[in-house]
C-alpha cells in the first residue's frame, strides 16, 4: 500500500472540539442515504469524522459495515479531496442498501469534494 493511501490519525477527527467546529459551521451535502457536513480546515489534507447512530442502523454489525465502507472510500479518495473536515452521518434507509450502492453514493460525494486540479 502506498504511503499516501493509509488512514493515519492525522486524517481523522478525534477530539470533541473538532466535531463541534464542524457541526457549528458547515455546509450540508445529502442524498437518500447520507448527510455530510463539510467545513474548510486550515491543514493541507481532508479529515474524516463519523457519526453513525443507533437511529440510523439499529444493529452494531450494520453500523460497523457502514463505517468500514465510509473509511475505505475516504481512504481511496483522500489525496484528491480539498482540505476540508467532513463528518458523515447516515439515514435509516442506508441499512437496506448493499455495499455497492453505499460505495456509489459515497463516491459521488467524494467527487463533489475533490479539488479541480487533482484529477488529471
UniProtKB/Swiss-Prot annotation:
It catalyses: Endonucleolytic cleavage of RNA, removing 5'-extranucleotides from tRNA precursor. It is an enzyme of class 3 (hydrolase). Its EC number is 3.1.26.5. GO terms for cellular component: ribonuclease P complex. GO terms for biological process: tRNA 5'-leader removal. GO terms for molecular function: 3'-tRNA processing endoribonuclease activity; ribonuclease P activity; tRNA binding. Keywords: Endonuclease, Hydrolase, Nuclease, RNA-binding, tRNA processing. Pfam families: Ribonuclease_P. The keyword Acetylation does not apply. Belongs to the RnpA family. Consists of a catalytic RNA component (M1 or rnpB) and a protein subunit. HAMAP family: RNase_P. RNaseP catalyzes the removal of the 5'-leader sequence from pre-tRNA to produce the mature 5'-terminus. It can also cleave other RNA substrates such as 4.5S RNA. The protein component plays an auxiliary but essential role in vivo by binding to the 5'-leader sequence and broadening the substrate specificity of the ribozyme. This is Ribonuclease P protein component.
Amino acid at each position: 500500500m502506498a504511503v499516501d493511501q493509509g488512514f493515519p490519525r492525522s486524517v481523522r477527527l478525534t477530539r470533541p472540539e473538532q466535531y463541534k467546529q464542524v457541526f457549528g459551521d458547515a455546509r450540508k451535502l445529502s442524498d437518500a442515504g447520507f448527510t455530510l457536513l463539510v467545513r474548510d480546515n486550515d491543514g493541507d489534507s481532508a479529515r474524516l469524522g463519523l457519526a453513525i447512530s443507533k437511529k440510523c442502523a439499529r444493529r452494531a454489525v450494520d453500523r460497523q459495515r457502514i463505517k468500514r465502507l465510509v473509511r475505505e472510500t475516504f481512504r481511496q479518495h483522500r489525496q484528491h479531496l480539498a482540505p476540508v473536515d467532513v463528518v458523515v452521518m447516515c439515514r435509516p434507509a442506508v441499512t437496506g442498501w448493499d455495499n455497492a450502492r453505499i460505495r456509489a453514493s459515497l463516491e459521488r460525494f467524494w467527487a463533489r469534494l475533490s479539488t479541480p486540479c487533482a484529477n488529471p
